[in-house]
Amino acid sequence: MGDSIGVIKTDDVFFERIVGLLPMFVMKMENYQVIRTLEVCVKRNLGSERLFDHYILHSIEKNVLRYSVDLYSRMVRALADKGFVEDYVFWDKFAFRYVYDDPKVGRDRTFTHDEAKMLWDSFVYLKLKCPQIDIKEPLI
């Protein structure tokens, strides 16, 4: 009655074609969808530099201060896996600013113990994957 149907994985050409359609949807994506797209593209080594630089990274820059701690940690880890070290302005002006600025309350950001631990683990992961990035400022 219940013979399972084998799942056939497609080749990477199919995924590249799907990823080629993403630029027209990135601006309408929610923050968690952008980060999930980044994670999948990095894990499968899909997507062009144009998609990353002009669409995904642009969306992250606009919204990073609104991310939850979990979403921010996932972003840091995905960018570490990608080996994204070329843009120091992004790290200093946008990504590391998250630790200090909270636009929702208009003052310094505060974290619970678990959130601080999650951020610490993500920064250590970033430093291990990308030793060129100076993470002293957000950790102090």
Could you tell me what each predicted segment is?
Residues 1-140:
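Eukaryotic RNA-binding helical-repeat scaffolds
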